[in-house]
Amino acid sequence: MLDYDRLATLIQRTKEASDFVIVFPHWGTEYNLGTDASQTEQATFLAAQGVDLVIGTHPHVVEPIDYIDRPDGGKMLIYYSLGNFQSLQRKEATLLGGMAKVTIKKDFKGARIVDFDMETLVTDYRLGGVRVTDYFDIITTYPWSKYSRAIAESGNIGNGNANFNLDYMFQLQAEQAAQVHEARQKAGLE
């Protein structure tokens, strides 16, 4: 159970000693592509404390990105979950992850986010000839921009999971890109 009073105290101490506050909560529901009520509640609390950036972990899948107003007039960027950077899980959406790209500027106005994005990552795995585990022994994380149909088709996409195929991967990446675009629009970046 989250101790809100203790967390508020820790955030306040951090704000007093720094120009920009980032929180990395372990939250959410595993494999849920959306957010849950506890994440929404905690995000509202973090915004009320003046947090600048939230990068969530735990669900193993990419969840929405949001850019919200704080009660103090500032803004808070939330990556609810970036999913897995690299994964040997066999659930469909766990093989796509995200890498946050955030530009923070500090000047006479203070420190603030001036740009952000997310690059989709793809975990590709295959056998290299020598089986050393029950899993694949060559695991590569590709940026979406470098992953191709040829790479996917030459590997073990989905490891036999019929629900995870190249078409599903393209659909999921398009949904992730749309969420990033929407958050960037809210921030006035597009």
Task: Tell what function each PLM region has.
Residues 1-190:
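Acidic, metal/ion-coordinating pockets
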